[in-house]
């Protein structure tokens, strides 16, 4: 668990300041995004047998928080990686994977507000 996620669990009232959306919105978004992610994953053409490959370092919820944190605060990917305990390139990859999906789920006004 990242320091940011731990902080948000401890102080949910600070979610708006840290991510640009409140804790209730984050919970709803996470639920919907996870479902959408699983749908996409099923449709994706697999190159490696199911169960193969390396496990992700961050859970899906942490990946969503990483993306929202970047959109709201604009740290470098190096700093983002340090905060979430992943490499700079992994932080970059996670951000771009989730950005596309979140753009579909969030209203344009909220995406602009986050940026």
Segments the model singles out, each with a brief description of its role:
Residues 1-115:
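Short alpha-helical elements
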């Amino acid at each position: 668990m990242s320091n940011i996620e731990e902080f948000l669990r401890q102080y949910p009232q600070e979610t708006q300041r840290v991510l640009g959306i409140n804790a209730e919105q984050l919970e709803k978004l996470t639920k919907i995004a996870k479902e959408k992610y699983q749908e996409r994953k099923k449709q994706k053409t697999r190159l490696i047998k199911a169960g193969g490959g390396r496990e992700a370092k961050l859970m899906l919820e942490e990946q969503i928080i990483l993306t929202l944190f970047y959109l709201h605060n604009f740290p470098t990917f190096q700093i983002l990686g340090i905060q979430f305990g992943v490499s700079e390139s992994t932080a970059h990859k996670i951000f771009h994977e989730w950005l596309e999906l979140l753009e579909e789920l969030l209203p344009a006004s909220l995406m602009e507000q986050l940026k």
